[in-house]
Amino acid sequence: MRIDIITILPELLRSPFEASIMKRAIDKGLVEVYFHNLRDYTTNKQKSVDDYPFGGGAGMVMNVQPIDDCITHLKSERTYDEVIYMTPDGETLNQKMTNSMSLLGNIIILCGHYKGVDQRVRDHFITREISIGDYVLSGGELGALVLCDALIRLIPGVLSDETSALTDSFQDNLLSGPIYTRPADYKGWKVPEVLTSGHFAKIDKWREDMAYEHTKNRRPDLLDN
């Protein structure tokens, strides 16, 4: 997978890709990530990427021109499966979406700022709009990082144990149940006996039951899907 991120704050994005799972994926050659500073594509001396909204109102709006030039440049070099805009009014990211999107080859992620981008960007360039929740952040960079992490960990070969991703919360619309590790008895707080029984069929059944109960208590809406 190749991910091209368009941003006005590339320095905000770099460090998460230099550690942990995302770094491992890059080092293995399983994913390529590139940052494109939108200010490099402006045609004005000030390198500004925003202007006042037509009709007045609070805030600034990101210009069409630098976004057009950046996306057009990238598309001249390769084909992209999706051009994604991170925005609070997009479809809310979920596990089903990341499962399917992890199979894509090349994607562009546009990080918004200020009041957002000129609507013509959304009309003519964006193929998918994604939100990470019903709240507003200072920019789309943190949302882009969430999306990247959620996608990259699903790429085959990234996790040392590929079955780990398949048993995460939200797979099969269930939250993960309780998990335990050693010691089996700590200050009298004991691990459920079934988990140390060695009876794998019973363990699987216990985990399924716990996942269902946990989901019913915490996120009953998931069971309606």
UniProtKB/Swiss-Prot annotation:
This is tRNA (guanine-N(1)-)-methyltransferase. It catalyses: guanosine(37) in tRNA + S-adenosyl-L-methionine = N(1)-methylguanosine(37) in tRNA + S-adenosyl-L-homocysteine + H(+). The keyword S-adenosyl-L-methionine applies. Keywords: Cytoplasm, Methyltransferase, S-adenosyl-L-methionine, Transferase, tRNA processing. Belongs to the RNA methyltransferase TrmD family. Specifically methylates guanosine-37 in various tRNAs. It is found in: Cytoplasm. S-adenosyl-L-methionine binds at residues 112, 132-137. Transmembrane segments: none annotated. Its main location: cytoplasm. Homodimer. It comes from Flavobacterium psychrophilum (strain ATCC 49511 / DSM 21280 / CIP 103535 / JIP02/86).
